[in-house]
Regions:
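Substrate-binding pocket helix/loop in short-chain dehydrogenase/reductase
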Residues: 18-19, 26-28, 124
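Active-site helix of classical SDR
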Residues: 42, 77
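Alpha-helical segment proximal to the catalytic Tyr-Lys
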Residues: 47, 89-94, 152
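Residue(s) in the substrate-gating loop at a strand-loop-helix junction
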Residues: 61
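Short C-terminal tail/terminal secondary-structure segment
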Residues: 66, 144, 155-167
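A conserved structural motif in NAD(P)-dependent oxidoreductases
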Residues: 128-139
């Protein structure tokens, strides 16, 4: 296992369905991608992170705490990631810091199918107090800060990067 000082675990999915259409397989797939694989990655690098006073940054979604129509699958999985964040922050302190970024919809390849419809994209942008969609750099800048020693007094936090949508 290589020596590392930080992990930014940036996986995600957008599987939007009403409850009546959700299957157990939908939940299992989303949990495997967003939670179980994060746990395995962290376990694989835990000793190196501990030795190097490292930092872990996980990713959630504003939907985990705010709630949106048809977001049951992803909101549930990302709420589990938030629980993992605060639990591991307590378990790994003082040697490893663990934080989580909870973005709102961000312009990305994963969101392209939804954002191709300009009416939908504009409507979602208007729902944010800052009246725009997020950019990857919005979350990346925060992740960079959380990985570095500049954030050495920050652990166990779920930080919204959502243009004000969560408030």
């Amino acid at each position: 296992v290589p020596e590392i000082k930080g992990i930014a675990y940036c996986v995600g999915s957008i599987d939007l369905k009403p409850l009546r259409m959700i299957t157990e397989q939908d939940f299992n797939k989303c949990m495997k991608l967003n939670l179980y694989s994060a746990v395995e990655a962290i376990k694989g690098y835990q000793e190196s992170l501990k030795k190097n006073n490292g930092s872990i940054v996980l990713f959630s979604t504003v939907a985990a705490q705010r709630g949106f129509t048809n977001h049951t699958i992803i909101a549930s999985a990302k709420a589990a990631v938030e629980g993992l964040t605060v639990s591991l922050a307590a378990e790994f302190a003082p040697n490893i810091r663990v934080n989580c970024i909870a973005p709102s919809l961000t312009k990305s390849k994963i969101a392209e199918p939804m954002l191709k419809n300009t009416t939908i994209a504009e409507g979602i942008a208007k729902a944010h107090p800052l009246k725009r969609l997020g950019e990857g750099k919005d979350s990346a800048s925060l992740a960079k800060f959380l990985i570095t020693e500049d954030s050495s007094w920050v652990t166990g936090q779920i930080i919204a990067v959502d243009g004000g949508r969560s408030k």
